[in-house]
Amino acid sequence: MRFAIVVTGPAYGTQQASSAFQFAQALIADGHELSSVFFYREGVYNANQLTSPASDEFDLVRAWQQLNAQHGVALNICVAAALRRGVVDETEAGRLGLASSNLQQGFTLSGLGALAEASLTCDRVVQF
């Protein structure tokens, strides 16, 4: 079965993102296809490369990045939500005159069209 996941919670402070990550791992382990994860609202904080958890805490931002690298799962970030929350790639940083970017490698700024496409091409969309 083909799945897409929508994450609306930040990497830390709520259970949404970590539950979504565990669900993603379980899907892959059970042989399902996870085509994409779409980060929306506060979920865009999962793509902030400046997140720095304590050494004894799980690094969820890097875990999402590894999921992308190992399994080819698309990690799409809502561009409007990201810009409102200060998560930008190099292109947007330059366009907005910002000193630097902070989008973690493996994540892609995209519009709601990416979510719509995932919804149309998947058997199930699960929101956290």
Curated annotation (Swiss-Prot):
UniProt similarity note: Belongs to the DsrE/TusD family.
Assembly and binders: Heterohexamer, formed by a dimer of trimers. The hexameric TusBCD complex contains 2 copies each of TusB, TusC and TusD. The TusBCD complex interacts with TusE.
Protein name (record): Sulfurtransferase TusD
Enzyme's top EC category: transferase
Single GO MF annotation: sulfurtransferase activity
Location of the active site: C78 (cysteine persulfide intermediate)
HAMAP family cross-referenced by the UniProt entry: Thiourid_synth_D (MF_00390)
Gene3D superfamilies listed in its UniProt record: DsrEFH-like
